Structure formats: C-alpha cells, structure tokens
C-alpha cells in the first residue's frame, strides 16, 4: 500500500528542499530592498522595520488561497481558460489523469497561454499552464503525458519554493529598476544643470555611479538566485518524470519530448553560461531516463 500512496499523494520530495537554496540566498537582498522602502517611513513616523517583512509575508499568504492564486498568477502570466476546441482535448485528458492520481479534478486548474513555444509548466500550488502551440502540435495522448509531468511537480511540492522565491524577488526587481531610473535622472540632471561647476559635475557623476553600483548589486543577486535555482531545479524534472512514469504516462511523455526535439528544443547547453541559464535537463537525456524507468520499473 505504501507504493501507490507515494506515487499519487502530495509528498515533499528532495528537490523541493534543495529548491529552497536560491530562496535563502535571496533573503538578505529582499530585506535590503524592504529596508529601502522602510527608511522613509521610519524617518517620518518611526515605524519599526519588522513590520515590513512580516506584512509582506502575510500578504504573500493570500497566494495560498487557490482562487486568488489562480486568478492572480493566471492574469500575471497572461493565461486564459481553454477554448471549446481545447476543452475537448483537455477535459477527458485531465479527468483520466486525476482519476489515476486519485485526485478531485478541481484541485488544480489548467490554463492556456497563447504562444508559439511548445511548452507547459506548473506554477503556484494549483495551476498548470500549457501553450496553445503544444495543444496544436501534440496528440491528446502526448498532452496527457505532459500534464502528468506538470501535475507531478505539484504532487512533489516542487513549485512551492519557486513561488516563494518569485514573491521575495519582487521588491528586489523594483528597487533595481528604480535605481537605474534614478541613475538616469542623476546623469541627465548633471549634464543639464551642473556643467558650469566642476564640483557639482563630480558630485552628480558620483551619485549616478553609486546608484548604478547599487542597482547592479541587486540585479546580480537576482541573476545568481536564478542560476542557483536552475542548477538545483533540474533534479525536480527527473523526479516529475519518474512520478509520471509510475502514473502510467511514461510513453506519451517520452513521445512529447521527442516532438520537442524535432522542433529544435531541449538541446544540451554548451558552455557554462548556457548551463546556468538552462532550467531543464536535455530532452534526450530525459527520454533515455524515462525509457530506462519503463524497462526497469522497480528501480
């Protein structure tokens, strides 16, 4: 009885734990970004700093509520409800998948993004996104394999740390962009109004340089967090593939990955920069592993 439960129920997998590493790396910069917002309030009304991170985290708890999460993330991602012809493919596919996973059909929502990319992904804790191009290019069986893989991300809690990381990164992104904006303002003001004074010109240049440096620090933190997330997150793809195989969707998932390969996707990254930027293992590697798991299901 233990085997089926581990395949079908939500269970925190190892990659869900390792996915916390980039989130932890981002926390100091998140706190610094909130400190920049807090400072004016402290100067005016003396607000304690801890109010801001606590309020921000409490606000983020709203994303745990499925209806809010689906509506908010769906809007931010530009996702929509499936059209009638897409429902004809997705409804029976999702119904069968939910039955095999012993889940109510309504626990997770499937949405569509209009895109020419052959892609699908899980986000939040209740949302599965598939592109319109994928629904056009893949057979219903292959779509089922892809959905089984994405559902497996949710069942393994792989998306929890990713959602938290995105939420924490928002103040960092805003502060970095605001810093670059102020740098442009400082440079423009220096060029327009301080050219007559060497001292004012030097002061303006120093201010612009300082703002640029601060902005790049926050931007570098985001890049580093994304790179770490990609490195530790590739194991979650293998774990989701494994669970999809155990649910009985190994063959259609492998076929869907072959379609990705035929379209020129899922290639092995060349060079360290490409490896840091790659969020998924090579598609051929995944196909080989899936086929090996189907040949030796006990491993």
Briefly describe each language-model feature range.
Residues 1-119, 172-234, 262-267, 296-299:
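Hydrophobic or amphipathic, alpha-helical segments that drive membrane association/targeting
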Residues 94, 130, 149, 240, ...:
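Residue-level signature of catalytic and energy-coupling elements of molecular machines
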Residues 94-98, 233-250:
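An active-site-proximal "capping" alpha-helix that borders the catalytic cofactor pocket
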Residues 117-139:
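Active-site scaffold of zinc-dependent metalloenzymes
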Residues 139-155:
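Short alpha-helix carrying the canonical HExxH Zn2+-binding catalytic motif
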Residues 151-170, 250:
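Catalytic Zn2+-binding segment of zinc metalloproteases
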Residues 159, 163, 235, 239, ...:
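Alpha-helix N-cap and coil->helix boundary residues
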Residues 217, 223-224, 254-299:
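Long, well-structured alpha-helical subdomains associated
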């Amino acid at each position: 009885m233990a085997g089926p439960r581990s395949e079908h129920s939500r269970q925190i997998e190892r990659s869900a734990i390792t996915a916390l590493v980039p989130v932890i790396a981002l926390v100091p910069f998140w706190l610094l970004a909130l400190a920049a917002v807090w400072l004016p309030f402290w100067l005016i009304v003396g607000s304690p700093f801890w109010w801001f991170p606590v309020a921000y985290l409490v606000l983020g708890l709203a994303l745990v509520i499925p209806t809010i999460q689906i509506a908010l993330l769906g809007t931010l991602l530009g996702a929509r409800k499936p059209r009638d012809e897409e429902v004809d493919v997705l409804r029976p596919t999702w119904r069968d998948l939910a039955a095999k996973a012993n889940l109510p059909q309504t626990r997770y929502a499937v949405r569509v993004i209009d895109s020419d990319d052959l892609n699908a992904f899980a986000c939040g804790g209740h949302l599965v996104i598939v592109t319109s191009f994928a629904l056009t290019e893949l057979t219903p069986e292959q779509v089922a394999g892809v959905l089984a893989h994405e559902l497996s991300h949710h069942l393994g809690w792989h998306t929890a740390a990713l959602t938290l990381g995105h939420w924490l990164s928002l103040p960092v992104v805003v502060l970095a962009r605001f810093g670059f904006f102020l740098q442009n303002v400082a440079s423009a003001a220096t060029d327009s109004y301080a050219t007559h004074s060497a001292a004012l010109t030097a002061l303006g240049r120093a201010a612009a340089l300082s703002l640029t440096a601060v902005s790049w620090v926050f931007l570098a933190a985001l890049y580093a967090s994304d790179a770490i997330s990609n490195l530790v997150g590739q194991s979650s793809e293998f774990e989701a593939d494994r669970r999809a195989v155990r649910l009985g969707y190994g063959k259609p998932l492998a076929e869907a990955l072959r379609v990705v390969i035929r379209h020129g996707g899922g290639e092995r990254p060349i060079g360290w920069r490409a490896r840091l930027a790659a969020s998924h293992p090579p598609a051929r590697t995944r196909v080989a592993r899936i086929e090996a798991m189907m040949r030796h299901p006990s491993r």
